Amino acid sequence: MNVLRFCAAPLAALALMVCTSAFAHDPSEKVTILQDEMLKNVPGKKALMIKVDYEPGQSSIAHKHEGTAMAYVLSGQIISQVKGEAAKTYKAGEFWYEPAGSEHMVSKNASATQPAKLLVFMVLAPDEKVLIPLEH
């Protein structure tokens, strides 16, 4: 019975979030893991390659990565801003680097009418988180 009392409030909040999101447009991007491999020449580290698909107007939440990230715009245009730097628009074929722990304040599709795709390559330890939401 104590377990039920302990879980009731969090479960009710979760149910409310799920019901609310069913009526709202999903603002988050689609992330696809393309490759996830341990690096034999760098003990204790792995390489992760992901594709990020943004629908028109979509954006990521403010976040940071525990690992080093390198991003390449496959199609469309992406607006990216790391804390302490100005926002920059990257076009297809352009790329940038984010040191481990950088706070990524803005990552979004620059277009309200066209989709955009981003290829991200990361190097991190197997127990490090790919994305940590920022509380701002």
Task: Label each PLM-derived region with a short phrase.
Residues 1-11:
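Bacterial N-terminal signal peptides that target proteins for export
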Residues 9-19:
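Bacterial N-terminal signal peptides
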Residues 20-26:
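Sec/Tat signal peptide C-region and signal peptidase I cleavage site
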Residues 27-62:
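A short glycine-rich, His/Asp/Glu-containing loop-to-beta-strand
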Residues 39, 43-44, 54-55, 84-101:
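Short acidic-glycine-tyrosine-enriched beta hairpin
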Residues 59-61, 79, 96-109:
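Histidine-centered metal-chelating micro-motifs
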Residues 67-85, 94:
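Glycine- and acidic-residue-biased ligand/ion/polar-headgroup-sensing regions
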Residues 86-87, 102-128:
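Ligand-binding loop in jelly-roll beta-barrel domains
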